[in-house]
């Protein structure tokens, strides 16, 4: 199923050092899904839900249910107490997965510690029938993520496969997808372009609307569907900024609409 994310509209929500005057909030994100005919919304760590009150959480779930929207939750920081807080929120809103980015700005556990933490938490996920989806995110190589998944050895722990992040670890998506697709339970569709800088000594990797970049989206969706375990494909955007935050948000909105229409044309 095709979905959008709080990282589809990153600028509209706000990034450190650049906050819009009227930032997008959860209800606004759901309204964008409704207006675009999207039935899955992944609400990630840039729009955290774990601090909502029980009443606010219930209202969110009821609103989403009434509109026919399935919610997914994303967290950042594989710290047991924080993961449990996010997991309880995922349970409360009916999310089938908890997408987790391992690192934070000041927390980068080594692989053995990551494995130990996930093994400790696995029974909590299993008892709630919620899957932990570990996102490939910059620092670790694909084989290290594979080692984590194989070492834990649980159907309740898999991969959230992002199409661009592993370039931060020096790996292209073909390599990463070949290794991690068998474990992928959630897919981030993030198209991209690569161009040389003007002096030719270096390259720049930037986002692009889905279908306008280098990512072979049709192929990755076909391969993901063949595994039988990947249940949602979530659109994310890396929208290069314009001169003002207002212009950037307009561009981001246009890219989102273009991307959704393209992805719908693929008959997900």
Kindly give the residue locations of the regions a language model identified.
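A short acidic, helix-capping loop that chelates divalent metal ions and anchors anionic groups
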Residues: 11-15, 106-108, 169, 241-246
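Non-cysteine beta-strand/loop elements that form the S-adenosyl-L-methionine
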Residues: 3-7, 99, 182-195, 234-237
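Active-site-proximal loop/turn and secondary-structure-junction residues that shape catalytic pockets
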Residues: 8-10, 45-47, 77-79, 102-106, ...
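Active-site acidic/histidine proton-transfer and metal-coordination neighborhood
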Residues: 31, 56, 61-159
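A short, acidic, flexible beta-alpha connecting loop/helix-capping segment that sits on the rim
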Residues: 78, 236-247, 251
């Amino acid at each position: 199923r095709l979905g959008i994310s709080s990282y589809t509209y990153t600028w509209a929500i706000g990034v450190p050092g650049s906050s819009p005057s009227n930032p997008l909030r959860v209800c606004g994100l759901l309204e964008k899904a409704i207006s675009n005919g999207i039935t899955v919304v992944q609400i990630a760590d840039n729009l955290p839900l774990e601090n909502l009150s029980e009443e606010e959480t219930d209202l969110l779930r009821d609103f989403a249910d009434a509109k026919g929207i399935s919610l997914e939750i994303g967290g950042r920081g594989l710290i047991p107490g924080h993961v449990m807080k996010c997991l309880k929120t995922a349970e409360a809103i009916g999310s089938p997965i908890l997408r987790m980015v391992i690192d934070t700005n000041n927390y980068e556990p080594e692989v053995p510690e990551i494995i130990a933490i996930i093994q400790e938490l696995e029974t909590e996920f299993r008892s709630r029938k919620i899957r932990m989806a570990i996102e490939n995110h910059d620092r670790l190589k694909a084989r290290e993520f594979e080692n984590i998944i194989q070492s834990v050895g649980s159907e309740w722990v898999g991969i959230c496969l992002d199409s661009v992040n592993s370039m931060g670890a020096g790996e292209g998506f073909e390599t990463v997808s070949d290794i991690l697709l068998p474990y992928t339970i959630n897919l981030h569709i993030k198209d991209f372009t690569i161009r040389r800088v003007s002096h030719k000594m270096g390259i720049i990797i930037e986002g692009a609307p889905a279908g306008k970049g280098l990512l072979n989206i049709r192929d990755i969706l076909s391969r993901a569907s063949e595994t039988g375990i990947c249940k949602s494909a979530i659109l994310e955007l890396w929208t290069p900024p314009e001169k003002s935050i207002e212009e950037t948000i307009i561009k981001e909105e246009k890219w989102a609409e273009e991307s959704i229409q393209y992805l719908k044309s693929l008959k997900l």
